[in-house]
Amino acid sequence: MISSKTSFIALIGNPVSHSLSPIMQNAALQYLGLDLIYIAIPCKDEDLELVLNSLKKINCKGLNITIPHKEKVFNLCSEISSIASKLKAINTLRLNSEKEWSGTNTDVEGFIYPLKNLNLTKKKSIVLGSGGAARSVIQGLINLNLSKISVISRNKSSVEELIKDFGNQIQLQGLLNTNNEVQNLIEEANLVVNTTPVGMKTAKHEMNVLPYGESFWRSLNSKTIVYDLIYNPAPTHLLKFSANKGCRTIDGLQMLVAQGLKSLSFWTNGLEVPFHIMNDALKNHL
C-alpha cells in the first residue's frame, strides 16, 4: 500500500517505457515488505543534472541509470566504485551520508551469474560487438579466468580501445567480422557472447537475423555455449539457431535479474532476495 511515507527508487534514462526493471524490482520490494516503490522516469540529456540534484532533496532511496546517461552521470557523483571506473559506465546510484550520489556498476556480476558453475577456467571465448556491454562482458570473463578472448566487431577503433583497457589482464585480440580467421575461432570457442542489438525486438531491428549474417556461423558446433544478452524476444533467433546445432544456450534475462538483485542490495545495505522472485515476475509478465 502506497502511503504518504512511501519512498521510491527510480530508473533514469531515455527512453524508459520499454524497461522491465519496475516489474522485477517492485516484486522484490513487495517480497521484502519495504515501504518502497520503483518507478521509471524519462530524462533528456540536458535535464540530467537538474533531475539528479532534485532527487537528492526528496524521498529517493536510489537510482538505476540506463542509456544514454551511463557515462554522463560520472560528473554528478562524489564517489565512484573501482568497477564503474574500469567499465566507464555507472548503472546504480545511492545517496551517501553527505547526501551526495555514490555510483557503481552491477553489470559484471549480472553477466557472470549464469556462468559461475560452468567451469570456464582456461577456456576460449568470442565476444560479438565492442560497445559498452562488451566492456562488462570482457571484465566478467577475466574474473572467470578464461585464457583468451576474441572480440569481433565492425568498429576497429572501439576494438582497439578495448584491447588498450583490458589487454594487460588477459590474452585479448580484436578482429573485424569479415576476417578469414573468424571461422577457426568459432569452431574452437567454448563460449560465444552476443553483445550486439541484432535480433532484439524493436521497431528498428529485424528479429529473424543472426549477428553478422548466416555464413558467419557455419562452423559453430555443439560444444560451444552461446550466450545472447538480448532477452526480448525469448529465445532470440540466434539462440534458436544455436540450440538446433546442439549448443547450450543462455538468454539475457538471467543477467537482467542478477544485476537487478545486486542493485537492490546496494540500495538496501545488503538485503537479499531469492533469484526466483524477480525471475518469476518477469516470466509472468513476458
Curated annotation (Swiss-Prot):
Residues forming coiled coils: none
Keywords: Amino-acid biosynthesis, Aromatic amino acid biosynthesis, NADP, Oxidoreductase
Pathway the protein acts in: Metabolic intermediate biosynthesis; chorismate biosynthesis; chorismate from D-erythrose 4-phosphate and phosphoenolpyruvate: step 4/7
Alphabetized Pfam families for the sequence: SDH_C, Shikimate_DH, Shikimate_dh_N
Residues involved in NADP(+) binding: 129-133, 229, 252
Catalytic reaction annotation: shikimate + NADP(+) = 3-dehydroshikimate + NADPH + H(+)
Catalytic machinery residues: 70 (proton acceptor)
Any one annotated GO CC term: cytosol
Keyword hit for Amino-acid biosynthesis: yes
Disulfide bond sites: none
Positions of shikimate binding: 19-21, 66, 91, 107, 231
Biological-process GO terms, alphabetical: amino acid biosynthetic process; aromatic amino acid family biosynthetic process; chorismate biosynthetic process; shikimate metabolic process
One MF term in the entry's GO annotations: shikimate 3-dehydrogenase (NADP+) activity
EC code: 1.1.1.25
Similarity section: Belongs to the shikimate dehydrogenase family.
PANTHER family from the UniProt entry: BIFUNCTIONAL 3-DEHYDROQUINATE DEHYDRATASE_SHIKIMATE DEHYDROGENASE, CHLOROPLASTIC, SHIKIMATE DEHYDROGENASE
Function: Involved in the biosynthesis of the chorismate, which leads to the biosynthesis of aromatic amino acids. Catalyzes the reversible NADPH linked reduction of 3-dehydroshikimate (DHSA) to yield shikimate (SA).
HAMAP family tied to this protein: Shikimate_DH_AroE
UniProt subunit comment: Homodimer.
Name of the protein in its database record: Shikimate dehydrogenase (NADP(+))
Organism: Prochlorococcus marinus (strain MIT 9215)
